[in-house]
Amino acid sequence: MTEELTKTTENKPIVIQAAPLVPAPDEIGVLSRTERAGFWLTHRMNLGIAKRLMTFGQRHIGSLWIYLATYNLMNVFGIENVETTDVDTPLVLVANHRSFFDMYTVSSVLFRRTMRPMELYFPVRGKFFYDNPLGWFVNLVMGWFSMFPPFFREAREARKREFDKFSMRRLVQLCSEGRGHIIGFHPEGKRNFSDDPYSILPAQPGIGKVIYSAHPQVIPVFIAGLGNDLPKQILGNWTGGPKIRIWFGEPIELQEFYEKGDRLRTHKELSDHLMAKIAELGEKDREKFG
């Protein structure tokens, strides 16, 4: 997706990124007026100067309030695995999903405990975050518009999956190129509400397809201790709530999957492999805290 156009004085290639993709008329046309407005707003906030401003806000404001709400409970392991990744190759973080706040908390840890250049993207369901102005506001306040690109998966609105073709292309582009790109995924596709913090849901093949197509760096992440009740979570920071544990694993080698055919079975096997690596981190957590 990129071409080397010239060379620096050190004889290193300057790589020019492809222009950000935009949806075709028949893809954007299936969305409602509100959804289209939400998409174009968020799309523009993830480009150029606007994205740099949003990243500044995440680093200096967003990460601060998350830190203030969790610092007494936070335990982080393996952050050096993120520090040593190549900033010129996109990094995908694949994590289990038990709380609405999983990736927000991970992003705060990244900003406050590493010096790595980064631009964050978190694919999200279009429902609420794109079809409701309140959802746009939550995306701004919680994620600085990093909840992008959207996917429309509601069974009653199957026709909107035409738009998902664009979102998949854009996601592959983000995972293929871009200095400092970090993309957060939950391979399970939805939150796990089981009482067992070490249980995992079946992996969905979509993440396997994206990674197969893009060949990014991939690091597994296991998260435990976060809840879904924001006031209770914040209060627990001072009243002895459950310890929050975030484990970053080593980069996952995926060459064996890239050598297989580009088909659904390969994508599912790759996704299952990612969940197995996340589960391995869960076992480390069980040994230490369980």
Segments from the language model and where they lie:
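Residue-level signal for beta-strand positions within conserved beta-sheet cores that form or flank
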Residues: 72, 116-118, 242-244
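Non-catalytic C-terminal accessory region of glycerolipid acyltransferases
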Residues: 2-37, 41-42, 161-290
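Hydrophobic helix-cap positions at the C-terminus of alpha-helices
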Residues: 82-85, 113, 174-178
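Short, flexible loop segments at the rims of nucleotide/cofactor-binding pockets, characterized by
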Residues: 52, 67-73, 158-163, 196-198
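A transmembrane-helix-recognition feature enriched in membrane-embedded lipid enzymes
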Residues: 23-77, 105-108, 112, 133-145
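A generic local structural motif
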Residues: 61-62, 76-81, 110, 168-170, ...
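Helix-to-loop junction immediately C-terminal to a conserved catalytic motif
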Residues: 65-97
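Catalytic core of membrane glycerolipid acyltransferases/transacylases, capturing the structured
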Residues: 86-160
